[in-house]
Amino acid sequence: MKVGTDGTLLGAWANGNQNQNEDENENENEDENQNENQNENGNEIILDVGTGTGLIALMMAQRFPKAQVIGIDIDADAVLQAQENVAASPFADRVTILLQDFSALTSHLSPLTSPPSVIVCNPPYFTQSLPCPDDKRTMARHDDTLSYRTLATNAWQLLSDGGELSVIVPTDQQARMEAEAVLAGFSLCRECKVKTSTNKPPKRVLLAFRKHPSTPLRTTLTIGSAEYHELTKDFYL
């Protein structure tokens, strides 16, 4: 399975429902949110949008053993590869990979049995550059297939009331991603700027949004640092 740094960071950083109720403003709704975030089997649902190889979906399944994880993608070859990766993993009974357009999930044909408590996405990020000659790389990297607006709007419609949308984007796309999320109704709750070395500016930023107003927790992470190894230690041999 191809493993990228962006996907590994997001899969290790994104919150599951176990961490949702740390916010003092949500304590009084804890039982309500727990019930809303669970399907008929009592498991929370985590949705990985644009799952690719299934890396993030598998990481979330490893981190949250009671969660049912659904990964979706519009690339049939990617879906087939992700399904093979899931079948070879210890989490095959809790991870489902579907050939599915994210926009279609808001319709009555949605395969979700209850609102997801977490949506994770490593979205395409090229907007006004020339298309890549490789069609599959174009699909993965150009946001014609999934704009930030579509991501934010559909995530708002699908997420449970106490749910969280977590993404990783280039730092030069942060303002645009935040603007679309706020326009959809979200509030930024966590930000982690990612550096490749301590003396270089951040290249990526991890962002988490919730439906309720919150004061964002802002941190910085350097690839290769002790903090980075602590965050990702469960996913590297």
Give residue spans per PLM region.
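Conserved Class I SAM-dependent methyltransferase catalytic core
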Residues: V3, T145-P202
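Conserved SAM/SAH cofactor-binding pocket of Class I
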Residues: A12-Q18, G42-L109, P116-P133
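SAM/dcSAM-binding transferase cores
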Residues: T198-L237
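S-adenosyl-L-methionine
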Residues: M1-N17
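Intrinsically disordered, low-complexity segments used as extracellular stalks/linkers
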Residues: G16-E44
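Residue-level signal for inorganic ion chemistry
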Residues: L10, N122, L151, F209
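Mobile active-site "lid"/loop adjacent to the S-adenosyl-L-methionine
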Residues: P123-T150
